[in-house]
Amino acid sequence: MLMPRRVKYRKQQRGRMKGKAKGGTFVQFGEWGLKALEPAWITAQQIEACRIAMLRVMKRSGKIWIRIFPDKPYTKKPPESRMGKGKGNVEGWVAVVKPGKILFEVAGVDEETAHEALRYAASKLPIATKIVPRHHIGGEAV
């Protein structure tokens, strides 16, 4: 699973997911990308499930870029515990995703395989997504 090696503070506040993504909104490395259309927390387990699903479709050919990283800890209190008595223990790690963010990129496979791989990855995620191509302006990739 993806998670930070070390963090300055063990626990974080939840925060808010207002507005659109500031960076990482264009396909930069691959030929096709999977773009988020809704805000959400994507867990490390969901990212790993997407990665495995894409590898299975692509039959280990081509290349995959994961453009998000789960750097936010989320906590949970034990079952049947009363309220109060401090914040719960860290349960896992999540990536905060805003609309417009590119989640995954694919290259080195034909268009049909890339679409199928990204469609399989999208089925593993709890948000609406769309498949976007890399933009070429004047014969040069942007």
UniProtKB/Swiss-Prot annotation:
InterPro entries: Ribosomal_uL16, Ribosomal_uL16_bact-type, Ribosomal_uL16_CS, Ribosomal_uL16_dom, Ribosomal_uL16_sf
Matches recorded under Gene3D superfamilies: Ribosomal protein L10e/L16 (3.90.1170.10)
One GO cellular component term: cytosolic large ribosomal subunit
Disulfide bonds: none
Recorded superkingdom: Bacteria
BP GO annotations: translation
HAMAP family given in the database record: Ribosomal_uL16 (MF_01342)
Protein name as annotated: Large ribosomal subunit protein uL16
Native species: Thermotoga maritima (strain ATCC 43589 / DSM 3109 / JCM 10099 / NBRC 100826 / MSB8)
Lineage start: Bacteria, Thermotogati, Thermotogota, Thermotogae, Thermotogales
Gene this protein is translated from: rplP
